[in-house]
Amino acid sequence: MSYEYGTGATAVGIRGAGYVVLAAEKRVSYGGFIISKTARKVYKITDYLGLALAGLFADLQAISKILRAEIEYYNIVTGRRISVRAVARLLATILYSYKYYPFLSETLVGGLEADGTAKLYVMDPLGSLIEDDYAAIGSGAPIAIGILENGYSKDMSVDDAKKLAIAAVRAAIERDAMSGDGIDLLVIRREEDSIKAEEESITI
């Protein structure tokens, strides 16, 4: 099997004042054959941090498992909460260490720091690390990014950010044959003195 047939997807991320929204569609396809219509590409890693990925599905699952294990190990050894920035830098280092046999994936890391500051990072398969306010990855990214650029503002509410993320993924689904079959969302937000992560699934 050629790798080019297993790497399609669309995922987006948006950060705002006290929140991060991650969203991705659910289709896994190989060439013209749809393997699954219910695949999860958005992962809640902790109550304050999540991933959205696009690429070869086995690699998406592997990355989420590796990161969960590394975070748990850090928590046990130090007894402290690892920051979102540190997680992003750790994952970038892990991805770069596999540069000769890379994970066929693009990754969004989003979450809230202990003080409520929202963070969103974008990574390519080799671990190049960019912090941004919004991003789109995967085969549908050229379509989704236009929707994000047109609709994003720094002072938008979390509800408006959810609507924008859904609109961006939906637009990609309509034009990208490798994306489809619904949308999974993860919303991480600050509520008073706590951070809350909410997962949602939308049928299209």
Curated annotation (Swiss-Prot):
GO terms for cellular component: cytoplasm; proteasome core complex, beta-subunit complex. The formation of the proteasomal ATPase PAN-20S proteasome complex, via the docking of the C-termini of PAN into the intersubunit pockets in the alpha-rings, triggers opening of the gate for substrate entry. Interconversion between the open-gate and close-gate conformations leads to a dynamic regulation of the 20S proteasome proteolysis activity. GO terms for molecular function: threonine-type endopeptidase activity. It comes from the Archaea. It catalyses: Cleavage of peptide bonds with very broad specificity. The active site is at T10 (nucleophile). Keywords: Autocatalytic cleavage, Cytoplasm, Hydrolase, Protease, Proteasome, Threonine protease, Zymogen. It is found in: Cytoplasm. Residues 1-9 form a propeptide. Its main location: cytoplasm. PROSITE patterns: PROTEASOME_BETA_1, PROTEASOME_BETA_2. One of its GO terms (biological process) is proteasomal protein catabolic process. The 20S proteasome core is composed of 14 alpha and 14 beta subunits that assemble into four stacked heptameric rings, resulting in a barrel-shaped structure. The two inner rings, each composed of seven catalytic beta subunits, are sandwiched by two outer rings, each composed of seven alpha subunits. The catalytic chamber with the active sites is on the inside of the barrel. Has a gated structure, the ends of the cylinder being occluded by the N-termini of the alpha-subunits. Is capped at one or both ends by the proteasome regulatory ATPase, PAN. Component of the proteasome core, a large protease complex with broad specificity involved in protein degradation. This is Proteasome subunit beta 1. It comes from Hyperthermus butylicus (strain DSM 5456 / JCM 9403 / PLM1-5). The lineage of its organism: Archaea, Thermoproteota, Thermoprotei, Desulfurococcales, Pyrodictiaceae.
